[in-house]
């Protein structure tokens, strides 16, 4: 089943003449693992951001973006928040609270989930990611690798269908990068989550896929 489809998608930023994306047709099958590879400035991040309306950049867009056959603009923000997860390149970009436990709970709180359900989901995800030892720590004390794992866990606690990763290990050391990608592969294998990842280097892509 196609979870995401792009039909003749084009985009140019406001004030720019050149299109960053031009007539892109793409079908993403549910449960697949996809890598978008290209040089810096080739439009990888722009393309990923098109797949979640709250992250779409300002500019001129044409074509269609479908989520399970529905135009993305018609999909509620509640559904997009829960079912389309996004992890940014910079580990510090999306952390919004000062404690690890609260960061895990924040997304669920924002969609109005009852507190008892939040506690269960947060406990499950903390155990799955092995972050119990730093569960009560300040987010400011975490390493880059820990922050990026926390970002991933904070997305996964929402039980998303799609995981969008924008060069997620480019700012991590090799060991942290390997740990992060091993976790992504585990999530994909065990939960069947659809993964779409942007990377700039074919060599890096080969290493990441072989983790």
Stretches found by the model and what they are:
Residues 138-142:
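Conserved ABC ATPase signature
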Residues 60-71:
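Conserved ABC transporter NBD signature motif
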Residues 159:
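Conserved catalytic motifs of ABC-family nucleotide-binding domains
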Residues 71-85:
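ABC ATPase NBD coupling module
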Residues 163-166:
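Catalytic Walker B motif of ABC-type/P-loop ATPase nucleotide-binding domains
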Residues 199-200:
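H-loop/switch region of ABC-family ATPase nucleotide-binding domains
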Residues 116-134:
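Conserved ABC ATPase "signature" region
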């Amino acid at each position: 089943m196609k979870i995401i489809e792009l039909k003749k998608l084009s985009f140019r930023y406001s004030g720019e003449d050149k299109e960053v994306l031009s007539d892109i047709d793409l079908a993403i099958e549910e449960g697949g693992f996809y890598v978008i590879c290209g040089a810096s400035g080739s439009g990888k991040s722009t393309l990923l951001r098109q797949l979640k309306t709250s992250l779409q950049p300002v500019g001129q867009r044409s074509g269609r973006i479908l989520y399970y056959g529905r135009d993305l603009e018609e999909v509620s923000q509640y559904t997009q928040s829960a079912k389309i997860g996004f992890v940014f390149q910079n580990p510090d970009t999306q952390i919004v609270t000062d404690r690890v436990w609260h960061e895990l709970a924040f997304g669920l709180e924002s969609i109005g989930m009852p507190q008892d359900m939040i506690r269960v989901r947060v406990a499950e995800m903390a155990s799955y990611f092995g972050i119990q030892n730093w569960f009560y720590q300040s987010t400011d004390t975490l390493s880059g690798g820990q922050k990026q794992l926390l970002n991933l866990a904070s997305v996964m606690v929402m039980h998303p269908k799609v995981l969008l990763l924008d060069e997620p290990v480019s700012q991590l050391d090799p060991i942290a990068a390997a740990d992060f990608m091993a976790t992504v592969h585990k999530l994909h294998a065990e939960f069947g989550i659809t993964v779409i990842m942007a990377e700039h280097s074919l060599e890096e892509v080969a290493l990441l896929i072989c983790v």
